[in-house]
């Protein structure tokens, strides 16, 4: 009985429209940032290196290079802190987890664009 109630509550919270994306895709995540009294949106653009599909507990990791330093951020897919998610380009990769990109730099870390 409680399992059905939990599933119903999770389904209500998962009502947000999320575009389909996969590891290797370049995405722009608009994150709500609260600084004192005021709130603003902060864009985080990078390559999705991992995706975890667990219903309401789904998450994805985005990696970008900011002034020569690699920055990774993990987002909860259905978090209220995420305002919007946009896919900028589709990447053509053969693995589900792209952790090997952490060791690569420059042109070696590029990902081919998916043609179709």
Swiss-Prot record:
One of its GO terms (molecular function) is structural constituent of ribosome. It comes from the Bacteria. GO terms for cellular component: cytosolic large ribosomal subunit. Keywords: Ribonucleoprotein, Ribosomal protein. The keyword Ribosomal protein applies. Gene3D superfamilies: 2.30.30.790. It holds the Pfam family Ribosomal_L19. GO terms for biological process: translation. HAMAP family: Ribosomal_bL19. Belongs to the bacterial ribosomal protein bL19 family. This protein is located at the 30S-50S ribosomal subunit interface and may play a role in the structure and function of the aminoacyl-tRNA binding site. This is Large ribosomal subunit protein bL19. It comes from Pseudomonas putida (strain ATCC 47054 / DSM 6125 / CFBP 8728 / NCIMB 11950 / KT2440). The lineage of its organism: Bacteria, Pseudomonadati, Pseudomonadota, Gammaproteobacteria, Pseudomonadales.
């Amino acid at each position: 009985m409680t399992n059905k109630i939990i599933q119903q509550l999770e389904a209500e919270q998962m009502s947000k429209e999320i575009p389909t994306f996969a590891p290797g895709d370049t995405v722009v995540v608009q994150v709500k940032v609260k600084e004192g009294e005021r709130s603003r949106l902060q864009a985080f653009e990078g390559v999705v290196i991992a995706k975890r599909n667990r219903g309401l507990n789904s998450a994805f990791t985005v990696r970008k290079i900011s002034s020569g330093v690699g920055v990774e951020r993990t987002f909860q897919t259905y978090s209220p802190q995420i305002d919007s998610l946009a896919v900028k380009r589709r990447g053509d990769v053969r693995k589900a987890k792209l952790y090997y990109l952490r060791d690569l730099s420059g042109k070696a870390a590029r990902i081919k664009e998916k043609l179709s």
